[in-house]
């Protein structure tokens, strides 16, 4: 064979090898070209015009809460008690009307002795003729009618007991109003937290929906690769298991949405047919808090603003006023009394006649009982002990508020810190998933690596959503913990 022919044969062989290699490279491309088209990954929905916001939910919960209605009725009861005690400052006016039918009693005879008919008034002269007279007959009247109007004014009771009972009732009414106001603010805060819990569940559902779509795309990719003998059957089964798990998480997320929506409907007390949509853009992060004052200053602010603290102060003051009023019987009771009566017959007329007679009387009455003194001192000690118990509760409440404020501040700081880190993590996870899928389609990445990228992307999406919701939840709690929502509230 000539050298020229030998060189031509080698060239032909190289051309055939190149053609065969190009054909091998084209087959996967043709296979990938037949990959089924999927629906795009769903985007998270934004706010809906006319949808619910946290403030709207709080307002509706406030106006429909049965717990708040109960507290307001307690306020009415306390106000009525103040009116009842106020009457004690005025003199006591009392009217009595009585009628009595008496049994028959034989008339009484009153002997009148002897008389000297015609004799002048004065000493009788000797020899004056005396005549024995008939005895006077006194009839017993069987009908007894009496109309009496009495007026009394307990001087010492008004000074020592009624005035302090009125102060105690006024403080109790103030405590009831403060309790109702505190309940109102707590209901509003809890309603906001319920709303954000529902929003969080909806975001979790959307993330789960996107995870299912990604798992379906991964399964189709790995099936195509399996047909091209680029992956093993075990890789296909692994992705099928991943898809099944994603579908399970989606079902749980949907159930969580249904549960939190039922909670929200209970809070709103609305119609079951009402369609609930989110009217607040929770995809936007809130501005970061630049910094906080010292925790001691925040705890003092909470103690000054929170209505629960003011309510306990009013309750303790009411108990001490009750203790002072309970000790009033230690001092003798002095009462001014007066009365007027119209009686038939009158006990002040002798002899009794069948006619009405008007009379009056006025005086001062003093009374004192050692038994009442012992009871009053014991009652006073009881109220003082209750007042000291209220003082201890107040100290415990302030300690709890300090812890609550510290926790709320930490939650705000953690949520703000998570905003930046989760945003960076989500961007990295999205880009990592995109690149990893392209590498897998090109045969330069394994199915396990793509699965890890999908898992990381789902986790990053969930973390980013949680961070934005946590911002709103933590601020609502901090606002309530510091008592800054008291300014915008209207006490009953």
Residue ranges, per PLM feature:
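Amphipathic alpha-helical coiled-coil segments
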Residues: 70-85, 183, 187-206, 217-219, ...
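Bacterial N-terminal signal peptides
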Residues: 17-29
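Bacterial Sec-pathway N-terminal export signals of envelope proteins
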Residues: 33-98, 104-106, 155-156, 161, ...
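A glycine-/polar-enriched beta->alpha junction
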Residues: 59-69, 76-92, 135-141, 150-167, ...
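Acidic, low-complexity, intrinsically disordered peripheral segments
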Residues: 32-35, 101-103, 461-492
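Periplasmic alpha-helical coiled-coil/stalk elements that build and connect Gram-negative outer-membrane
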Residues: 3, 180-301, 411, 415, ...
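Small/polar, glycine/serine/threonine/aspartate-rich low-complexity segments that form flexible
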Residues: 39-50, 96-151, 281-292, 324, ...
């Amino acid at each position: 064979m000539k050298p020229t022919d030998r060189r031509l044969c080698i060239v032909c062989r190289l051309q055939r090898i190149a053609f065969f290699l190009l054909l091998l490279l084209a087959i996967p491309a043709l296979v990938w070209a037949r990959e089924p088209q999927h629906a795009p990954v769903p985007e998270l929905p934004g706010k809906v015009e006319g949808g619910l916001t946290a403030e709207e939910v709080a307002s509706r919960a406030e106006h429909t809460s049965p717990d708040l209605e109960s507290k307001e009725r307690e306020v009415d009861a306390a106000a009525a008690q103040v009116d009842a005690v106020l009457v004690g400052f005025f003199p006591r006016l009392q009217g009595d009307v009585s009628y009595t039918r008496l049994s028959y009693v034989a008339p009484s005879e009153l002997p009148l002795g002897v008389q000297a008919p015609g004799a002048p008034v004065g000493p009788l002269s000797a020899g004056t003729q005396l005549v024995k007279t008939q005895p006077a007959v006194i009839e017993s009247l069987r009908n007894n009618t009496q109309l009496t109007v009495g007026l009394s004014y307990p001087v010492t009771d008004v000074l020592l007991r009624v005035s302090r009972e009125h102060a105690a009732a006024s403080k109790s009414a103030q405590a009831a109003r403060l309790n109702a106001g505190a309940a109102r603010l707590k209901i509003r805060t809890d309603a906001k937290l319920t709303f954000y819990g529902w929003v969080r569940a909806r975001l979790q559902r959307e993330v789960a929906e996107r995870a299912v779509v990604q798992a379906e795309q991964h399964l189709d990719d790995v099936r195509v690769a399996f047909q091209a003998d680029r992956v093993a059957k075990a890789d296909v089964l692994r992705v099928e298991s991943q898809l099944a798990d994603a579908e399970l998480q989606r079902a749980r997320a949907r159930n969580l949405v249904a549960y939190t929506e039922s909670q929200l409907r209970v809070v709103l007390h609305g119609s079951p047919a009402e369609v609930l949509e989110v009217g607040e853009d929770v995809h936007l992060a809130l501005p970061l808090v630049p910094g906080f004052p010292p925790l001691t200053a925040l705890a003092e602010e909470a103690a000054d603003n929170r209505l629960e603290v003011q309510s306990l102060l009013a309750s303790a003051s009411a108990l001490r006023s009750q203790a002072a009023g309970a000790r009033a019987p230690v001092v003798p009771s002095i009462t001014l009394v007066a009365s007027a009566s119209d009686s038939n017959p009158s006990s002040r007329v002798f002899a009794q006649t069948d006619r009405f007679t008007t009379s009056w009387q006025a005086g001062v009455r003093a009374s004192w009982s050692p038994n009442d003194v012992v009871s009053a001192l014991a009652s006073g000690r009881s109220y003082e002990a209750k007042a000291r118990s209220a003082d201890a509760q107040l100290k415990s409440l302030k300690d709890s508020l300090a812890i609550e404020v510290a926790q709320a501040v930490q939650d705000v700081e953690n949520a703000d810190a998570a905003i930046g880190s989760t945003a960076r993590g989500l961007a990295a996870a999205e880009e990592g998933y995109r690149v990893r899928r392209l590498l897998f389609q090109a045969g330069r990445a394994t199915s396990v690596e793509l699965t890890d990228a999908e898992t990381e992307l789902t986790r990053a999406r969930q973390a980013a959503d949680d961070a934005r919701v946590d911002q709103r939840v933590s601020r609502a709690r901090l606002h309530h913990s510091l008592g800054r929502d008291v300014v915008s509230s209207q006490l009953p």
